[in-house]
């Protein structure tokens, strides 16, 4: 394992103890949370910002600040999302940006939930383009998702491989051979220390998140009923809904691809790997939100 967060953590330990560092991290997490939600409200609307806020809270965002190993990847996710929203119209090459995010993620992350640094910014980018760019079609968004995912994998993989090569070149300890065997081991779905299979665990993660989704759906229905006097709610046409939400749904499935690809890692580290479902939770709630068209009722004119 590569502890890329240590160059930052060690200087901090000179001046602060672990408890104080956790308080600093919590403060940083709160600032990033408020900043991101504010930008989401401005760029994508209040409903989307609420979905992101509740999803982050449900997946234990603020508790992550107490984990020195898990906090860095969440900070990368939040900061990259904020920069994306701040400069979304000025970023000329999305794929270069995704590549840089992937490299930074691999450097600082302890193999916790790295996929959130791809899934969350990509959701934000697609949602923004759907709102502001009428020229792009469903197939265009799918191409963006596939290309961005491929670029992220390349950036993540190259950075990881370069660490092995540099270390092996300096110390000549056969690290590359050992690393390859570990990759094979981590991608297996069987583990001698666990009785649960990867399919069972993914099923549990799915069911747990569906509970949150149904709760949010019921809450949204109540809100809509309360708004019924001033607003009218329409269902979108199936074709329009499908075209709009297929890209979002595909991004939502990313955690399951990760779980099945790295079955052994998922089984062994369920205590934190469930946070990948943040991508699923946000994506599915966005899809549910997009079912409705909410319009302000026109006042009847009487003579």
PLM region spans:
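Membrane-lumen/periplasm interface segments of specific transmembrane helices
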Residues: 145-226
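Juxtamembrane "helix-exit" motif on the non-cytosolic side of transmembrane helices
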Residues: 58-63, 163-168, 230-233, 257-269
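Hydrophobic/aromatic-rich transmembrane helices and adjacent perimembrane loops
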Residues: 268-290
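Membrane-interface helix-loop-helix junctions at transmembrane boundaries of multi-pass membrane enzymes
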Residues: 226-252
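Juxtamembrane segments of multi-pass membrane glycosylation machinery
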Residues: 7-25
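Transmembrane-helix motifs of polytopic, lipid-linked glycan transferases
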Residues: 26-49
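Membrane-interface alpha helices of multi-pass inner-membrane proteins
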Residues: 94-121, 144-157
